[in-house]
Amino acid sequence: VRLKDSPLYPGGGGQLPDRGVLRWAGGESAIAGLEMSGGRLWHVLADPVEASGVALVEADAAFRQMMREMHTGTHILNALVFQNFDGALVTGVQMNDDGTARMDFDLPQADNDKLRALEAPINEVMRQNLAVNCVYVTQEEAQSTPGLIRSRSVAPPPTDEGMIRIVEIEGLDRQACGGTHLANTGNSRPISILKIDNKGRHNRRIRLGLVGLGPLA
């Protein structure tokens, strides 16, 4: 189903798409997926129905909150790794629907114990209640400013006006990102570093999770 407007995030950059329900005069259906085609967002319904006319999309608030917490947590981890490990870049990221995530970094010489020790400063940032804001800069500025683009392989797509979205954590970090985040770091549950794996000669994989969810429930 294609709608004129939608409040749902289609996913990308390692973040899962929003979940929700579509309601219209003739019924309702869970939204099983979101797909971009022809520059428009299509809502894939879980049931074989025909929907038309005025419709209402309701996002799954609990799932979106979890994604916001997890995504903000990965930004904090990213910032601390970048600052403490010589500007190490991200080589991969994936957030999961059980409140866990993994981030891969180009860290061939890193001490895994020092990486595990980042759990305490991550949670200290949470306790500091730092504001999280978004601003837009030109592509040229994003590409020429050290540290704004942290991934070795991908960058958020520009807007129709050629601007790049930058997520700022007050006093801590600025980086390009198109996903959803908290308005304040204090709105997150604590985060635990679950495991660190060596993935090849260069990559270290850090697995983290929200305390109280999934394996940390």
Model-derived regions, located:
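Active-/binding-site microenvironments in catalytic and ligand-binding cores
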Residues: 1-217
